[in-house]
Regions:
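N-terminal, positively charged nucleic-acid-binding surface of large information/translation enzymes
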Residues: 1-241, 340-345, 350-353, 360-376, ...
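Conserved active-site neighborhood of enzyme catalytic/cofactor-binding cores
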Residues: 26-60, 68-71, 75-79, 157-162, ...
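Short histidine-centered catalytic/ligand-binding loop motif
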Residues: 31, 380, 415-426, 492-500, ...
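Extended, non-catalytic structural segments that build the interaction scaffolds
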Residues: 92-100, 325-345, 487-503, 694, ...
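A sequence-level detector of short linear motifs
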Residues: 151, 245-247, 370, 380, ...
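Catalytic alpha/beta core of large soluble enzyme barrels
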Residues: 228, 232, 236-364, 377, ...
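Short acidic, Pro/Gly- and aromatic-enriched capping/linker segments at domain boundaries
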Residues: 282, 433, 439-461, 587-606
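Surface-exposed intrinsically disordered loops and tails
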Residues: 380-430, 571, 575-577
Length: 729
């Protein structure tokens, strides 16, 4: 009430500045006790620097785009992504998102005041603001002009539940990789032209293990390690009793065969015997097996090749052979990897290098698609091209599996009113089980068992992701990897181990940044392209877009300039002027531009990764470079002297700040950073509303007061260590 915070600003006018950046929370969710922890650390340093004579400006911010908002609105409206544009217009949906994203602003403001956190809530930066978006467009144009923005068709993490691709830093948020128990199978791939010693005892097979049996119908190759030793083994199938000779890695022989059975005679075996005899009859190096052919394991669909014009034809014998791959190991499995190029980045890489086709479907639009659609189920027959079905699909075999969800988590019956029943999904029989049972009945399964393995999940839906071929826009962050590593060494990390370890190792293993998001509420990608993709333009400002629209009007592609119609004046940067327009979908999608050759250009439909929004805040919060250019260029507001957030931001906000600063400005975005630990319950478990162990910050402050709470949080453990929160002390 005495406006002390504002006075601390005015009384330090003209003093040296201490630059601090506030990471933007999303106001569509309630604040938690962990926010008190992070804000206590931030407030402590900022107040200390103020007392030491510095002016410490602290602009609040709101993160307003992206999956958290969209999924919340879908739940509230009882719709799915597929309903948008059908039962509800994009304009109506985005209006609901804009309203929903700020619904807990009052509670956030209330907590800010109650805990005594000094931050400027009167003039916050808001990521959905048109001026904020304009700065993002300017940054993207800088990347585009440097050749760091490109479009590629690659295998990417994809969340069927969220309906969009994910970046590697989203996939590496804490808790995204989880141990799951899945049905696995060692498949038997029947050889076509075996070596003589492989054909002397029963049917010859290659053995390959997979934790994702649903990908086996998309298999087009087997991969062996060039330096791995392999053996041919005469034995019997444990399920059917069939005589067989199998090939697998020598180092894994006793993983699949009981050493006690080594001395048993093959001829003495009787079906049902627990000990199955075996005999090694040949040894090979990986290259000895390369080029050998096998029969398609699950012949539902024949592979096709597609030319540059989109014309397809049945693949002429390139598939179903053994190829080499350096990444094959003998840590688990059989030392032979099943290759489904449409569902794995490594698979796609080695297949492409060896000239192996991917197994694609052709839909009614003539487009090539994987066997699984974007919702996570096998394509329905009536969604496919009739000629393709007639020539390449075994309808009798495939029809039983069409429309089946590859993971139960994607099946809508296990999500009611937006709540996913993970236990029910896990208890139900999965497609993997059905495929394994089908293989067992057809004598194509050597071993079926449950296996616990680490699998990635979507950071917002908590459901498993797929690796899926996507047409996406990427930032070529790998081109600047060495510079990012070099600049990271100049940052003062607390703890230092986070900078050199978690963050440093992340930079060393950097992938290109998947920027595209196939959603509705977010910053639109400012790239327009001709239909044949021969010409494109990247827009870097509203004024540039305004001028390009004028050219389009003159060319007859647009009736009028919607920005001019609304009275928008280019170059006037006040809020009143920018509130006349909306840079979001669907309005920006309605804009048709004209290419240099006079062709119409439509906007690429994607939005950009919401993490780019927050990583761009040093520039977008001041509408750089359209306003306040001198402030930033003279280093009055950039880089930050200090930032602080939870350790979960290491591969989130900390990374995107660093990446954008390096790639656009060849600098760091911050000089010092505290990465605080997690706030756990008193037993050391992660807090969760679902588990009922979350601590309400409002009632805690009401009962104990804000100063005791702040003191407890910063003195009970080092800021970077996890805190076991216990009100009993």
């Amino acid at each position: 009430e005495n406006d002390v915070f504002a006075k601390s600003m005015t009384e330090r006018e003209g003093c040296p500045s201490f630059v601090f950046y506030e990471g933007p929370p999303s106001a569509n969710g309630m604040p938690g006790i962990h926010h008190v922890m992070a804000r206590t650390i931030k407030d402590t340093f900022c107040r200390y620097k103020t007392m030491k004579g510095f002016q410490v400006k602290r602009k609040a911010g709101w993160d307003t785009h992206g999956l958290p908002v969209e999924l919340g609105v879908e739940k509230a409206l009882h719709i799915t992504k597929e309903d948008i544009g059908k039962t509800i217009s994009v304009a109506e949906y985005n209006a609901a998102c804009r309203k929903d994203v700020m619904k807990f602003t009052k509670e956030w403001t209330d907590l800010t005041h109650k805990m005594g956190y000094w931050v400027d809530l009167e003039n916050p930066y808001i990521t959905y603001d048109n001026r904020y978006i304009e700065t993002l467009w300017w940054l993207l144009k800088q990347l585009y002009n440097k050749g760091l923005l490109y479009k590629g068709y690659t295998i990417q993490p994809y969340s069927p539940a969220a309906g969009t691709g994910l970046s590697s830093h989203e996939l590496n948020q804490p808790g995204c990789y989880r141990d799951v128990k899945d049905t696995t199978v060692v498949g038997q791939f029947k050889m076509k032209n075996p070596k003589p010693e492989m054909a002397e005892w029963g049917t010859p097979y290659f053995l390959a293990w997979t934790t994702t049996p649903w990908t086996l119908p998309s298999n087009t190759a087997l991969c062996v390690g060039p330096k791995i030793d392999y053996v041919a083994v005469q034995t019997y199938n444990g399920y059917t009793g069939e005589k067989m000779t199998v090939v697998l890695a020598k180092a894994l022989l006793y993983t699949h065969f009981n050493k006690k059975a080594e001395e048993l005679a093959l001829e003495d075996y009787k079906p049902g015997d627990k000990l199955i005899p075996f005999k090694v009859v040949g040894e090979y190096k990986g290259p000895d097996l390369v080029g050998m052919e096998y029969e398609q394991l699950i012949p539902w669909v024949k592979p096709v090749t597609v030319d540059e014009n989109g014309k397809w034809q049945e693949a002429a014998g390139e598939a179903f052979r053994v190829i080499p791959g350096d990444y094959v190991t003998t840590e688990d499995g059989t030392g032979i990897v099943h290759i489904a190029p449409t569902f794995g980045a490594d698979d796609a890489f080695v297949a492409r290098a060896a000239g192996i086709p991917s197994l694609f479907m052709i839909n009614k639009k003539g487009e090539t698609r994987p066997m699984v659609d974007l919702t996570g189920k096998f394509y329905l027959l009536d969604e496919l091209d009739e000629a393709f079905v007639k020539k390449c699909v075994d309808v009798e075999k495939y029809k039983e599996y069409q429309g089946r969800w590859v993971k139960n988590a994607y099946d809508p019956q296990f999500t009611v009113d937006g709540k996913y029943d993970e236990k029910a999904a896990a208890a139900a029989e999965s497609l993997d089980i059905y495929i394994c049972m089908m293989m067992k009945a057809a004598n194509k399964a050597f071993k079926i068992e449950k296996h616990v393995h680490n699998y990635p999940h979507c950071w917002r839906t908590d459901k498993p992701v797929l690796y899926y071929p996507l047409d996406s826009w990427f930032i070529r962050s790998t081109a600047c990897k060495d510079r990012m590593i070099e600049l990271n060494k100049t940052i003062n990390w607390k703890p230092e181990s986070t900078g050199t370890g978690r963050f440093g190792k992340w930079l060393e293993n950097l992938n290109d940044w998947n920027l595209s998001r196939s959603r509705y509420w977010g910053t639109p990608l400012p790239i327009w392209r001709t239909e044949d993709n021969s010409e494109e333009i990247c827009i870097g400002s509203v004024e540039e877009l305004y001028n390009e629209i004028e050219k389009s009007v003159a060319a007859g592609f647009m009736k009028s300039n919607p920005y001019k119609d609304k009275g928008f004046v280019p170059g006037e940067y006040n809020g009143e002027n920018y509130d006349k327009i909306d840079l979001h979908r669907p309005y920006v999608d309605d804009i048709i531009l004209v290419s240099k050759d006079g062709k119409p250009m439509k906007r690429e439909a994607d939005l950009i990764d919401v993490w780019f929004d927050s990583g761009a805040m040093p520039y977008a919060q001041i509408h750089y470079p359209f306003e306040n250019k001198e402030l930033l260029d003279s280093h009055q507001v950039y880089p930050a002297d200090f930032i602080a957030e939870g350790v979960d931001q290491t591969r989130g906000w900390f990374f995107t700040l660093h990446a954008i600063a390096t790639m656009v400005f060849d600098s760091t975005a911050y000089k010092a950073v505290i990465s605080n630990g997690l706030v756990l319950d008193k037993n050391g478990n992660k807090m969760s509303k679902r588990l009922g162990n979350a601590v309400d910050p409002f009632s805690t402050i009401e009962k104990y007061g804000s100063d005791p709470l702040r003191w407890y949080m910063i003195t009970n453990s080092s800021p970077w260590d996890n805190l076991k929160f216990d009100t009993d002390g």
